[in-house]
Regions:
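Conserved, well-structured core segments that form or line functional sites
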Residues: 1-183
Length: 183
């Protein structure tokens, strides 16, 4: 497998979102390498996207979204679950891709269908907010044998507050994959 480098992330968010499907999320934890194949993502296109955390401008919570591409934006939801996003596009754009589900590949003992569950299984928490994904402990890699995938597009989950943006088909997943959180 080959680690994804900064130019991969410094592209249009929709392109990055679709290209992440089938790649490996890798986290080295206490001498153990956890690997999951990304099977579901959601694109958040920037400050004009009403469902995006960046839609109301830069805050202490979402500042990482406005930073350079290729960093992890990790935040807490419901006071108990972490979610991991991949920052995309140019600095100050405020765009990211939420990793929603993984298919376990190595050393993942828990369920990974849903952003909170996958963060728990991969031991990703807020301490990794801002982590450079081109580093050595938490990164995304292209598998040597990545097969072509059929991509399905649906509306994002849990963004009913976002008006017309709630219905845009910005959730992408590998069609017929059993580890997708919701069809």
């Amino acid at each position: 497998m080959q680690k994804l480098l900064r130019p991969f992330y410094d592209r249009a968010t929709l392109t990055v979102a679709k290209d992440l499907l089938g790649t490996y999320l890798v986290h080295d934890v206490a001498g153990e390498r956890r690997i999951g194949r990304i099977v579901e993502v959601e694109a958040y296109l920037g400050s004009h996207d009403r469902a995006s955390h960046s839609s109301k401008g830069r805050t202490a919570r979402n500042a990482v979204m406005f930073g350079p591409p290729g960093h992890a934006y990790v935040y807490l939801i419901y006071g108990m679950y972490c979610c991991m996003n991949v920052v995309t596009e140019a600095q100050d754009h405020g765009a990211a891709v939420l990793v929603r589900a993984l298919a376990p590949v190595a050393n993942i003992p828990l369920r990974t269908q849903g952003p909170g569950l996958l963060c728990k299984a991969m031991q990703i928490d807020r301490r990794l907010n801002g982590h450079d994904l081109t580093g050595d402990t938490l990164f995304i890699a292209m598998p040597a044998d990545r097969p072509a995938v059929r991509i399905a597009a649906r509306p994002r989950i849990g963004v009913a507050y976002a008006g017309e943006w709630a219905e845009k088909p910005l959730r992408f997943y590998i069609q017929d994959d059993p580890f997708v959180s919701r069809k």
